[in-house]
Amino acid sequence: MILSSYNTIQSVFCCCCCCSVQKRQMRTQISLSTDEELPEKYTQRRRPWLSQLSNKKQSNTGRVQPSKRKPLPPLPPSEVAEEKIQVKALYDFLPREPCNLALRRAEEYLILEKYNPHWWKARDRLGNEGLIPSNYVTENKITNLEIYEWYHRNITRNQAEHLLRQESKEGAFIVRDSRHLGSYTISVFMGARRSTEAAIKHYQIKKNDSGQWYVAERHAFQSIPELIWYHQHNAAGLMTRLRYPVGLMGSCLPATAGFSYEKWEIDPSELAFIKEIGSGQFGVVHLGEWRSHIQVAIKAINEGSMSEEDFIEEAKVMMKLSHSKLVQLYGVCIQRKPLYIVTEFMENGCLLNYLRENKGKLRKEMLLSVCQDICEGMEYLERNGYIHRDLAARNCLVSSTCIVKISDFGMTRYVLDDEYVSSFGAKFPIKWSPPEVFLFNKYSSKSDVWSFGVLMWEVFTEGKMPFENKSNLQVVEAISEGFRLYRPHLAPMSIYEVMYSCWHEKPEGRPTFAELLRAVTEIAETW
């Protein structure tokens, strides 16, 4: 529905001895339809009302004395002053460059300027100023759940249960985001009883018509912190009161987007090589340290294996991609050969090896949690218009806390090996590729979706090779004829349906990663 209104706009044009008064009519259209959407990208700021302005000139009725002229309106400010926000540090942060400011966990800071989404200028209570990583702080509001130790924003149901079992205390609890946007779940550890084993209960925090939060309908509160405080002192509908908040805050430092703001080049003299931990498409990978206190993975790039100049330019862009489910790129060493790529270190190594080494030990909930982690990372890449091109279990890594992160996104564009680049080459990942890739070399987020379906299959077969008895040519023929991978025996039908939806012949028939994430999360919450 379109609402139209007519407004008279009067403007005054002054000269040295007279002014002319013009009246214009402007027709304003306001869309009241909730179904209409804005375009995703704007190439320029549009003003549709501009072309609808019509001038109605009026002649001067006489001279206006200079003393009676209306003053011109003041010029608008060149910049809108950004409101300063108070934040609280979630982690300690030691300065890495002279421009950095130290952070101490739980202390408050004032944000002065946001240089980019990942690095902000802040001031501490003593007046010291400097740059800090934005993912180390959170806005200091009583309604902001991130300031509380018991809140975990980005955690799956399985990861929550793993944390609570490690704590293994009656009443140990966390609060986490639920599968429904804007809703939350309390997960509580219940000790063993005479007739029951230890268990973990999950309680949905709901909202009533008055906007109050509750678990037990008789006890509703204006905010979630108030609700948690009440249930820390009263069970009131729960199996036990909330006794021990279980948190990660401060215990596991997240990676930062680069070692500092705009720092993409790393001095090789600042790196110490500890031991070789593997090898890949481009060369040997070492465990190392940067400036003797940050563990890193150092990839030495074999000369001639990569288009180095193109990659260096791309690395500057890749460093701006920062997400808890992506392996963080810290920078590159270009001062001498070979070129080094420095990334976040993941203690449990490659996901494919992790699955094979732990065969028979991983519960189905853990396998689904792996898929959920990867889907979260891929949804972030999709949202930012970035294509992986080689998504597979071999290109995902596992942290010390069993969080899975995506590695090597976009790297295949810089490979110079024809055996890997050509779809007819022996090293080309045909078994993870959709028809439009192996036939026309056409990549998109939807080709990544196909690969994600195959990766899910790898996870639920605990590391089997897809199409293990078929050659690349046979796989191409089978896929073209409509053949798809079978359902793994560890995968319930609900999981296989998600996998299968990724393998639609046409890209437009496949779901987005945002849709896949909702589906996987829904299954995880109902198991």
From Swiss-Prot:
A motif (Nuclear localization signal) lies at residues 68-73. InterPro entries: Kinase-like_dom_sf (IPR011009), Non-receptor_tyrosine_kinases (IPR050198), Prot_kinase_dom (IPR000719), Protein_kinase_ATP_BS (IPR017441), Ser-Thr/Tyr_kinase_cat_dom (IPR001245), SH2 (IPR000980), SH2_dom_sf (IPR036860), SH3-like_dom_sf (IPR036028). Transmembrane segments: none annotated. Residues 150-246 form the SH2 domain. Keywords: Adaptive immunity, ATP-binding, Cell membrane, Cytoplasm, Immunity, Kinase, Lipoprotein, Membrane, Nucleotide-binding, Nucleus, Palmitate, Phosphoprotein, SH2 domain, SH3 domain, Transcription, Transcription regulation, Transferase, Tyrosine-protein kinase. One of its GO terms (molecular function) is ATP binding. Residues 35-79 are annotated as: Disordered. GO terms for cellular component: cytoplasm; cytosol; nucleolus; nucleoplasm; nucleus; plasma membrane. ATP binds at residues 277-285, 299. It catalyses: L-tyrosyl-[protein] + ATP = O-phospho-L-tyrosyl-[protein] + ADP + H(+). Changing residue 299 to A: Impairs kinase activity. Residues 51-64 have a biased composition (Polar residues). Its EC number is 2.7.10.2. The active site is at 390 (proton acceptor). Non-receptor tyrosine kinase that plays a redundant role with ITK in regulation of the adaptive immune response. Regulates the development, function and differentiation of conventional T-cells and nonconventional NKT-cells. When antigen presenting cells (APC) activate T-cell receptor (TCR), a series of phosphorylation leads to the recruitment of TXK to the cell membrane, where it is phosphorylated at Tyr-420. Phosphorylation leads to TXK full activation. Interacts with PARP1 and EEF1A1. Interacts with SH2D2A. Interacts with FYN. This is Tyrosine-protein kinase TXK. It comes from Homo sapiens. The lineage of its organism: Eukaryota, Metazoa, Chordata, Craniata, Vertebrata.
